């Protein structure tokens, strides 16, 4: 049975959530009595902070480890994060500590890709396989066994199309042309681009603002670029002012939204796009407190004097807000898949097995009409732990 303990370190500078797994007996795998699967497999996982999105990923690292241990493995997920998303040096130190502890595999969601490279290079030198989640773009100067994630620019483009949909374009939201979508259909970038091949830009009209992450960093810039790339094609959409950086933080998201709400009245500012879930939930709270939140769920035409919230990530918390209509649409980044597939690939790497170089989450739109497909019970691929054990 998987035991969990909350560990706090670094005088409140670092926060750690440690999941300790104890392997069961199970049938012998292909390795026989001396099979690698019988030994403890430690996966050192470090997200950039401990907010809801990364807690969701950690939970699914643990759930996959529970399944592996039930099949006879002895997998331990050791999870530790910086206290804040801007504590780049702390995440570097965490990875270096994992190297010193000689964990079997390191999984990391970088707070900043450049900042962690020296620590990843140390892991490479020590022969410890590294999995990077939250992006697919290959990184120079380091060796990465597998990337689990998505193209951040594409994810933001998906969000941009959801905004266009709500304000007159074809799709599933607002008053534009309705597109029949089978339940199994992903509303990913490919679907949106095909849907908008013959869209009339003149039908789409809106104005809004952007809350970005940490200004100038890889993830924030990629998302800004992807969002703007789509919006620049539609003259009827106006982005007011410059983005405000909220450092992927909910409280700062509240402050950024309040700044925009004081600067523009709801009749001229129709929407807020926040580039992450925490900031989006903050923007939602600010608009709700001011009495201007659009809580229609996107099923009716936008109401004058209301501000619609669009964001990126998708967690159990934000999915509940989508169901309640308070977030119009959010782009799924696959946090459950990060953990679920991350543990699978980590165990396979510890067993000396090959894993895919990339696992694409395929960012896609979540809205009131399909929210039940995501949380509380995300649709995850089955893992054949018995086969992995037999080959270990």
Where are these regions (language model features)?
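Bacterial N-terminal signal peptides that target proteins for export
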Residues: 1-10
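Enrichment for repetitive, rod-forming helical segments
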Residues: 10-11, 230
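Alpha-helical transmembrane segments
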Residues: 12-16
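A residue-level marker of the well-folded mature domains of exported/periplasmic proteins
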Residues: 22-392
């Amino acid at each position: 049975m998987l035991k969990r303990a909350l560990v706090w370190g670094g005088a409140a500078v670092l926060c750690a959530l440690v999941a300790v797994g104890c392997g069961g007996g199970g049938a012998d795998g292909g390795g026989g009595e001396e099979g690698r699967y019988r030994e403890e497999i430690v996966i050192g996982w470090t997200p950039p902070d401990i907010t809801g999105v990364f807690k969701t990923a950690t939970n699914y690292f643990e759930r996959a480890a529970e399944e592996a241990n039930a099949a006879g493995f002895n997998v331990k997920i050791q999870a530790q994060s910086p206290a804040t998303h801007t504590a780049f040096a702390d995440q570097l130190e965490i990875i270096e500590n994992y190297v010193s502890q000689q964990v079997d595999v390191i999984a990391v969601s970088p707070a900043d890709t450049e900042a962690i490279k020296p620590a990843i290079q140390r892991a490479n030198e020590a022969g410890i396989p590294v999995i990077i989640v939250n992006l697919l773009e290959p990184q120079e100067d380091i060796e990465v066994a597998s990337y689990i994630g998505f193209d951040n620019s594409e994810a933001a483009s998906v969000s941009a199309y959801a905004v266009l949909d709500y304000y007159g374009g074809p799709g599933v939201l607002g008053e534009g042309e309705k597109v029949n979508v089978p339940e199994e259909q992903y509303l990913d970038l490919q679907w949106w681009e095909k849907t908008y091949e013959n869209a009339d830009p003149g039908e789409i009209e809106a104005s809004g603002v952007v809350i970005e992450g940490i200004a100038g960093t890889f993830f924030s810039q990629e998302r800004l670029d992807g969002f703007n790339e789509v919006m620049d094609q539609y003259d009827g959409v106006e982005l007011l002012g410059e983005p405000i950086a909220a450092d992927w933080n909910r409280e700062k998201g509240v402050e950024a939204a309040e700044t925009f709400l004081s600067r523009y009245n709801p009749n001229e500012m129709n929407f807020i796009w926040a580039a992450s879930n925490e900031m989006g939930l903050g923007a939602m709270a600010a608009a709700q407190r001011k009495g201007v939140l659009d809580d229609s769920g996107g099923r009716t035409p936008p109401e004058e004097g209301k501000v619609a919230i669009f964001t990126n990530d998708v967690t159990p918390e934000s999915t509940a807000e989508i169901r309640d209509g308070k977030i119009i649409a959010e782009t799924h980044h696959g946090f459950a898949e990060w953990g679920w597939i991350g543990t699978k690939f980590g165990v396979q790497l510890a067993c000396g097995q090959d894993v895919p170089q990339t696992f694409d989450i395929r960012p896609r739109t979540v809205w009131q009409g399909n929210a039940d497909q995501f949380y509380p019970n995300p649709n995850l691929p089955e893992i054949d732990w018995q086969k992995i054990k037999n080959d270990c």
